[in-house]
């Protein structure tokens, strides 16, 4: 995340452009509905880690520009729904926002899962970047992780990292 000195006037709203897609920077190629069939989950069990393949459905829709006084974000609202091959029951569900701040090059990912965990991961990239990494760490006030009491006690998440790669064929992938 790149530091940025915002104006002293924190009340005057930034002037957004109506064309969100043209202002998404490195997030623009991610907009749309995607399906991935090569996922592998590593799940902790008492007898050791279990590896499960999965199919992921990922939808990213442009949202109107968002302002916090002089701060201006363009973004994508997303939902990812994951099932195991041949199953209909949800294996993992996640919602949130991918946000791009053109003035700084900062990218934020806010995510929440219905098992009681949320985070904000942050990073920085050029508008035309084909790869970028976002990170969150437990205890941070700006890119942190918060969990329900059971997860905090039994399965503490110390950090989160995701690297996104935009491919020449118009697709994208991530590693976390």
Predicted features and spans:
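Hydrophobic/aromatic-rich structural module bridging two neighboring secondary-structure elements via a short loop
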Residues: 65-109
């Amino acid at each position: 995340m790149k530091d940025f000195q915002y104006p002293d006037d924190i009340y005057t709203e930034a002037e957004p452009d109506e064309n969100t897609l043209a202002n998404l920077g490195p997030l623009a190629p991610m907009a749309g509905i995607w399906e991935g069939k090569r996922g592998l989950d590593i799940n902790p069990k008492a007898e050791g880690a279990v590896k499960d393949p999965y199919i992921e459905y990922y939808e990213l829709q442009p949202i109107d520009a968002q302002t916090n006084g002089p701060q201006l974000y363009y973004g994508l609202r997303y939902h990812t729904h994951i099932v195991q091959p041949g199953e209909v029951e949800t294996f993992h569900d996640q919602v949130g926002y991918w946000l791009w701040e053109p003035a700084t090059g900062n990218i934020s990912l806010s995510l929440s899962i219905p098992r009681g965990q949320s985070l904000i991961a942050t990073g920085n990239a050029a508008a035309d970047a084909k790869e970028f990494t976002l990170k969150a760490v437990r205890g941070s006030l700006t890119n942190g992780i918060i969990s329900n009491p059971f997860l905090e006690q039994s399965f503490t998440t110390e950090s989160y990292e995701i690297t996104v790669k935009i491919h020449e064929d118009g697709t994208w992938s991530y590693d976390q």
